[in-house]
A protein has these predicted regions:
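Short terminal alpha-helical segments
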Residues: 1-44
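Hydrophobic alpha-helical packing segments in soluble, helical-rich domains
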Residues: 40-60
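Amphipathic alpha-helical binding modules
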Residues: 78-126
Length: 126
């Protein structure tokens, strides 16, 4: 028996959403010598949170079809655990902690995305 679903049914990502997700993850994880503006951090955090909430149920669906205990299953369930932890956390007090939270959401989205088929768009393989 696979892990219990903790989220609503998946909202499948479109090709445009996948492209935007890739750009958002890149922005969140781009190295910078200075902290970004608070407004930019907030906007990107909201976007990444939304994507993580879409990705979690998709990965949960995939995990349900995996062999329990296999390497892929362990990596996917670890990514799900990290995503749930990040989604349950807040940005904290101050810009530095908000940037850290945004970056964590970027890493979470990247890890979750790695557990989906590359061509998956709206629930079908392309």
């Amino acid at each position: 028996m696979g892990p219990t679903r903790t989220t609503p049914e998946p909202v499948r990502l479109t090709a445009a959403m996948r492209h935007d997700l890739t750009r958002a993850v890149g922005r969140a994880l781009a190295p910078s010598a200075v902290l970004p503006r608070a407004e930019d951090v907030e906007e990107l955090t909201v976007r990444l949170r939304g994507y993580a909430m879409c990705l979690v149920p998709e990965v949960e669906d995939r995990v349900g079809g995996m062999e329990q205990g296999a390497t892929e299953w362990r990596e996917a369930t670890s990514a799900l655990d990290d995503a749930r932890r990040a989604l349950g956390a807040g940005p904290g007090a101050g810009l530095r902690s908000a940037v850290g939270h945004m970056q964590e959401l970027g890493r979470v989205c990247h890890r979750l995305r790695c557990h989906l088929p590359l061509g998956r768009v709206n629930g079908s393989e392309s």
